[in-house]
Amino acid sequence: MISVRRGLSQLWYWGKRGVIGIIALWMAGILIFAFLPVPFSMVMIERQLGAWLTGDFAYVAHSDWVPMDEISPYMALAVMAAEDQKFPDHWGFDVGAIESALSHNQRNQKRIRGASTLSQQTAKNVFLWDGRSWVRKGLEVGLTAGIELIWTKRRILTVYLNIAEFGNGIFGVEAAARHFFNKPASKLSASEAALLAAVLPNPLRFKVNAPSGYVISRQQWILRQMHQLGGKTFLQENTLD
């Protein structure tokens, strides 16, 4: 009986130290990535390991980091128009969108709608595994609060654009621009940026190089939203250009 208690005590001790260590790593990551490029994300690691485990050794999760000054302003505008139009104003969470999503999901349980902001998506993609669970969502909330506290909005947007998944093995807007349009991210047009943003909800299902009718329709909607937001002026007014 004593040995069992001792074993449980040691398990608790090392488990607690492990949790503290992970939290410390996350905190260090938030501080470091406030200034330095993010070399890889948890999503990239997960995709790479998944490919190797299935025998796909040709798969390479690829990303080319570029600063915001080397990204077309249309791209920043497109992802905000598509994913989070209140990004400059909220502190990581869009309460109105959350309430709307909860109401929708109660009525349509077969078609679940999310309400994650760009800040939440950035925190999740950089630091957490893929999937849906209350534990992961709770960690996402804490990490989102952390990056909103430490990073500027411009920094959050820069990291997001450099780690977002745009296709199979294609991460970051620079890799996407060169792969799909044979040009650097700085040269993306409004239409090209809107097309890239249109596949973000599910880049493994929706294809930039073979867009479905839905993707084309969403691209046109994003272009209209970009115009309604005010175009490049919207970025300048919110110090995001």
Swiss-Prot record:
Reaction(s) catalysed by this chain, per the record, are: [GlcNAc-(1->4)-Mur2Ac(oyl-L-Ala-gamma-D-Glu-L-Lys-D-Ala-D-Ala)](n)-di-trans,octa-cis-undecaprenyl diphosphate + beta-D-GlcNAc-(1->4)-Mur2Ac(oyl-L-Ala-gamma-D-Glu-L-Lys-D-Ala-D-Ala)-di-trans,octa-cis-undecaprenyl diphosphate = [GlcNAc-(1->4)-Mur2Ac(oyl-L-Ala-gamma-D-Glu-L-Lys-D-Ala-D-Ala)](n+1)-di-trans,octa-cis-undecaprenyl diphosphate + di-trans,octa-cis-undecaprenyl diphosphate + H(+)
Q: Which GO terms describe its cellular component?
A: peptidoglycan-based cell wall; plasma membrane
Q: What class of enzyme is it?
A: transferase
What molecular functions are annotated in GO for this chain?
pentosyltransferase activity; peptidoglycan glycosyltransferase activity
Which Enzyme Commission number(s) are listed? 2.4.99.28
One GO biological process from the UniProt record?
Answer: regulation of cell shape
Query: Topology in the membrane?
Result: Single-pass membrane protein
Q: Which UniProt keywords apply?
A: Cell inner membrane, Cell membrane, Cell shape, Cell wall biogenesis/degradation, Glycosyltransferase, Membrane, Peptidoglycan synthesis, Transferase, Transmembrane, Transmembrane helix
Q: Where in the cell is it found?
A: Cell inner membrane
What the entry lists under InterPro entries is as follows: Glyco_trans_51, Lysozyme-like_dom_sf, PBP_transglycosylase, Pep_trsgly
Please state the pathway this protein functions in, per its UniProt record. Cell wall biogenesis; peptidoglycan biosynthesis
Could you tell me the superkingdom of the organism this chain comes from?
Bacteria
Residues passing through the membrane, by range: 18-38
Return the HAMAP family for the record: PGT_MtgA
PANTHER family found in the cross-reference section = BIOSYNTHETIC PEPTIDOGLYCAN TRANSGLYCOSYLASE, MONOFUNCTIONAL BIOSYNTHETIC PEPTIDOGLYCAN TRANSGLYCOSYLASE
Q: Which family does it belong to?
A: Belongs to the glycosyltransferase 51 family.
Functional description taken from the UniProt entry: Peptidoglycan polymerase that catalyzes glycan chain elongation from lipid-linked precursors.
Q: What is this protein called?
A: Biosynthetic peptidoglycan transglycosylase
Q: What gene name does this entry carry?
A: mtgA
